[in-house]
Design a protein with these regions (language model features):
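Outer-membrane beta-barrel proteins
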Residues: 46-48, 79-84, 136-141, 193-194
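Repeated loop/turn-to-beta-strand initiation elements of outer-membrane beta-barrel proteins
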Residues: 24, 49-52, 86, 144-147
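Outer-membrane beta-barrel "beta-signal"
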Residues: 81, 180-194
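Solvent-exposed loop/turn segments connecting transmembrane beta-strands
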Residues: 26-41, 59-70, 85
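Membrane-embedded beta-strand positions of outer-membrane beta-barrel proteins
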Residues: 26-28, 42, 54-56, 76-78, ...
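Transmembrane beta-strands of outer-membrane beta-barrel pores
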Residues: 30-34, 56-62, 80, 95-101, ...
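Sec/Tat signal peptide C-region and signal peptidase I cleavage site
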Residues: 18-22
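Extracellular/periplasm-exposed beta-strand and loop segments of Gram-negative cell-envelope proteins
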Residues: 56-71, 100-111, 115-128, 157-168, ...
Length: 194
């Protein structure tokens, strides 16, 4: 009872604060859309040169031939705008976290010390968390519409279990650790500003 009352109180306080906020925007990352990964972002202007972007995506599809590319990601980002919020150049400072279940991919690519070729005969299931910095630019198209491009680099820590195939349940290894350094964000966002 007290938890529900507290939660409702916080939601009502946040709702009353929204009209004070200069701008709110909804966005979708067209790069995720191209991979059939549903995604949504919300950005709120906090001050004349600062905003908070919270984006997330989920891919729950099992593909043909037993391949898996299931994952979810949450990525909050504080942004500093060089001119005004929602226009022009910005720097972003983001965190990221999520879970994944990948396997059955028959390509022999190694990229930034990641052994994607292992996914041909294995399935990796685990979680990750990290942080990074990004640079982006927003072009205003019309009163309510914008397009944004952003690239980020950073670090992610992941812990995962290894299975012998995309659908097998027997573990080959558990709690493996990997520290990734490289691109952590790539976006071409279509934005609607309220």
């Amino acid at each position: 009872m007290n938890f529900k009352f507290g939660l409702i109180s916080v939601i009502l306080m946040l709702m009353t604060a929204l009209p004070v906020v200069a701008q709110v925007a909804l966005k979708t990352n067209l790069l995720y859309d191209a991979t059939l990964t549903p995604n949504l972002g919300l950005e709120v202007g906090l001050a004349p040169k600062w905003s908070l972007d919270i984006s997330g995506n989920i891919n729950a599809w099992t593909l043909s031939d037993g391949r898996r590319w299931k994952h979810w990601l949450a990525q909050p980002e504080a942004r500093y705008w060089f001119c005004d919020c929602f226009s022009g150049h910005f720097l972003g400072f983001h965190a990221l976290g999520g879970q994944y279940n990948y396997g059955g991919w028959k390509h022999g690519v190694n990229f930034l010390n990641n052994r994607f070729k292992d996914l041909a005969n294995e399935r990796h299931q685990g979680w990750y968390a990290g942080a990074g910095v990004a640079y982006g630019y927003t072009w205003i198209l019309a009163k309510h519409w914008s397009v944004e491009a952003e690239l980020g680099i950073g670090w992610a820590y992941t812990r995962y279990d290894v299975y012998p195939c995309a659908h097998c349940g027997t573990k080959l290894a558990e709690k493996r650790v990997h520290n990734y350094v490289g691109p952590t964000k790539a976006a071409i966002n279509l934005i609607y500003v309220f």
